[in-house]
Amino acid sequence: MSEPRKILVTSALPYANGSIHLGHMLEYIQTDMWVRFQKHRGNQCIYVCADDAHGSAIMLRAEKEGITPEQLIANVQAEHSADFAEFLVDFDNFHSTHSDENRELSSQIYLRLKEAGHIATRSITQYFDPEKKMFLADRFIKGTCPKCGTEDQYGDNCEKCGATYAPTDLKNPKSAISGATPVLKDSQHFFFKLPDFQQMLQTWTRSGTLQDAVANKIAEWLDAGLQQWDISRDAPYFGFEIPGEPGKYFYVWLDAPIGYMASFKNLCDRTPELDFDAFWAKDSTAELYHFIGKDIVNFHALFWPAMLEGSGYRKPTGIAVHGYLTVNGQKMSKSRGTFIKARTYLDHLSPEYLRYYYASKLGRGVDDLDLNLEDFVQKVNSDLVGKVVNIASRCAGFIHKGNAGVLVAENAAPELTDAFLAAAPSIADAYEARDFARAMREIMGLADRANAWIADKAPWSLNKQEGKQAEVQAICATGVNLFRQLVIFLKPVLPLLAADAEAFLNVAPLTWNDHATLLSNHQLNEFKPLMTRIDPVKVQAMTDASKEDLVASQTDTGESAPAGNGELAKDPISAEIEFDAFAAVDLRVALIVKAEAVEGADKLLRLTLDLGGEQRNVFSGIKSAYPDPSKLDGRLTMMIANLKPRKMKFGISEGMVMAAGPGGEEIYLLSPDSGAKPGQRIK
């Protein structure tokens, strides 16, 4: 038997400036399931994380609330810890970047980089908020991306195209703090010489450490040439002062990833059998994995490995990147009640419902994951209650009534139990590859076979026949053993269900290797319902409560609707028109037959629209909001049907579809209510 693997795993650090929401939880649940699988298999797998507790945002929020930054991050850490615990995210240590360990390691790594010649110093022209009397951190400047032209982007990187840049490259900058137009002032800054590591990064990023799609994106940045990275910020700033440089602080993205190391060191200092160097030394044979979202790939796949290489530490074994979460096919929305905080979800629903749904959707790629609330209810109720738990509930009563709760030794379906045994390696491979969706499909396929076999044997009918009781006991004992196998396979995803099943089965905590055996002549405990169906009313209550969270947050922050800063304030209602002018516009329901990108056009999609007997070709500037045009296929929308055709570079546009929003990614194509038909007039 091979030696247990030594694995250290991290998730991205949640920022200590707000609540955890379901988009965040996607990553922590994904990581937790993988860690639990490794532990389930007998490997030494350590999962550490921390709150990302530095930066201007925290300093400014604390100032606004009249408390110290230290008090703020302590309050937020308590909230985060409670949310994670109730979602069954089982960290071995959850620390803070505002810690002695992180200060020590950040200073050490910086000084090692400096001694090796990887730190440069020069004066830069930096934005300064004339109203707040402070230099502006990158995330407190907003404007237009200099690379792709997307509006409302932060001063350090573009969430649309992934480009990184200096804040001074941003077009039309505004202070996100005061709204003032910032002025430029000179300041002495410190830079990490990232280009020193170009060759190493080209090799490392193609060594299997990244998914192919991520490696391809990184290659684009590498091919464009790396730039020195500004790692300093000016006072006032909440963070660690750079050694020997009064008034200069480490940029939060320097000490944040070092927080992984600091959290592990904090754990090592309290755990004698753990050796920090065994996991972080240059020659470490332990495995190191970071789970992150695709929005922070550049920091983890470029800056972080270069910092580690330059300071004499080991680099990650792999970086697992996931996509964003959408809800009902769209970005999470506070007004629609789909921007759901972790706490709001927990107030209404079991964490295991969401854990299973995420698992059923998470592949090993970087595609976005959609939480469709109707599908969520149907899938959980069908798979977990209707398939898995149903097996135990079908069989347990007969065993308790007919054999005092004792499983007989006879295996009534050896071919089926052998099939379950044979499926284990494939399921394990799917877990290992982080292809949770495939693992869940294979497990539910087994559950379908078990239910079909029990239905075919119909112990409820046999039990009414004279002399069939022994056969009933054999069938039900086999059914309970099949249920036990499913629980073993699902335990990394559903630890609460597994614990309740272990209590019913009257067994010690199940491990992966237990799948190779069957229970026989074994006493069961009383069967109690293991999981209840999701009530759609509770889902609706959750979304309603999320809308209430929005109202509460507006009240807490002194916001009001819509006079001060709502949509009408941004885009006032146009001048009145006569009814006849409006009546001249012919609005129709249209079916999007096909949506496709237009070669050579950055913003346009070509829409083929069906008006109920007539097709139209329409060009629409909505590509930024719908990067995957195929998702629009088959959708109903609204169009101006009598707009004079317009000749464009790419063809003739025969109308205009209707959408809301300020532009860029925030465009929302309008749709009629269900039941509307293509070609119907909109009145």
From Swiss-Prot:
CDD domains assigned to the protein according to its UniProt record, in alphabetical order: Anticodon_Ia_Met (cd07957), MetRS_core (cd00814), tRNA_bind_EcMetRS_like (cd02800)
GO cellular component: cytosol
Protein residues bound to Zn(2+): 145, 148, 158, 161
Presence of the UniProt keyword Aminoacyl-tRNA synthetase in the record: yes
EC numbers, comma separated: 6.1.1.10
Catalyzed reaction equations: tRNA(Met) + L-methionine + ATP = L-methionyl-tRNA(Met) + AMP + diphosphate
GO MF annotation, one: ATP binding
Keyword Ligase: yes
Positions that bind ATP: 334
Enzyme category, top tier: ligase
Span(s) of short sequence motif 'HIGH' region: 14-24
Co-factor requirement: Zn(2+)
Oligomeric form and interacting partners: Homodimer.
Similarity-based family: Belongs to the class-I aminoacyl-tRNA synthetase family. MetG type 1 subfamily.
Name listed for the protein in its UniProt record: Methionine--tRNA ligase
Organism: Pseudomonas fluorescens (strain SBW25)
Source organism phylogeny: Bacteria, Pseudomonadati, Pseudomonadota, Gammaproteobacteria, Pseudomonadales
